[in-house]
Amino acid sequence: MVLVWDRPVTDEQRPSRRRLPAGDIARVSVFAALIAVLGLPGTLNVFGDVVPITLQTLGVMLAGAILGTWRSALAVAVLLVLVAAGLPLLAGGRGGLGVFAGPSAGFLIGWLPGAALTGWIVERGGRAPGTMRMLAACLAGGVGVVYLCGIPVQALVTGLSLGKTALLSATFLPGDLIKAVLATVVARGTQRAYPDAIPAVHRERLRAGGR
Amino acid sequence: MKGLTGAYVPGGSPLHRLPAGVKLAGLAVCCTALLLLRPPAALAVAAVVVAALYAVSGVGVTAAWAQVRPVRWFALALFGVQLVVADLSGAVSSTLRVVLAIALAGLVTLTTRTADLMAFLERCLAPARFAGLDPYRLSLLLSLTLRSVPVVAELATRVREAQRARGVERSPRAFAVPLVVGALRHADALGEALAARGLDD
């Protein structure tokens, strides 16, 4: 129910209100911050600083599983915009436009469709997405799509062939698979403790509340 | 909060005074040009130009090195691999290309205030109005995220302490689940507070 006390709701105000209500702004910004904070504990360097293994991709998968398709993509976009503006929000205090010119640029850009696909698959699961569906969502979005975007860009930047780049990237695969499993466990735990963390449940509650 | 100020180095050089939009456009042009330059000699000239730009900006060697430092091992590995699969000139040019692109992007970061870049981005976001998105809400989203980083970091510290008190330091689940639930609770309270202040009216 919408109560308007002192001014009529004009037609110009309606679309923007429908598209980005206060609750979405809050969730998106806090999750963008959460992905940044997950980069703080430090990076596990396997290959020097090439493409650091961080918990940040865990945050990307969690954002997808909890916020749903477009909110999670928006959270990643907000984070990347702030990084581009020069803030050291990526793991190891990286930031600035340099990261978008470097070899791991594609992996970062891949977070966008990756989070969205994770969210999309979880949303198809309705009010009670199962563990297997969550795992599939994290693997497809958080690992599959991210690699699909990252490897060609790395090949382009380094001038190595696609096959060689893919082989180099395979060293990160075990870590990313563990992170996908961890994201599934954490998302399940969160949704059990806080049912509103399931995208479909959240949407229904908003609809019922009229907000 | 420390570390959220960006890498900006104050100064009065011509590069500092250029508008953010011009610098970003210049960066895009330069990065494309770097991809098209093939002979090592041309790239060596480009390297001299980049070094000259750094000298003009007067940001200092430490700040300059901090921009390139994160890719040092990568550059070394790339050089080695290229030396094996291609030849010396190929190795030199592809390594230089990556390092120079990163150095140029770093130069824009070093000479542009975060606030100026954000203002430029907000101007770029203005056409979002036609897609039904409110530029004011988008800029609120950006500043709210900046504000949320210290809040979530503080939450993470508290969860770590609780984890230690419970004796489950080694369980990543005992860290991440309370952190995510706490972040969501904070987000939903924040959303209600924004709505209560009339953001949705």
Tell what function each PLM region has.
Chain A
Residues 49, 125-211:
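Membrane-embedded alpha-helical hairpins and interfacial helices in multi-pass inner-membrane proteins
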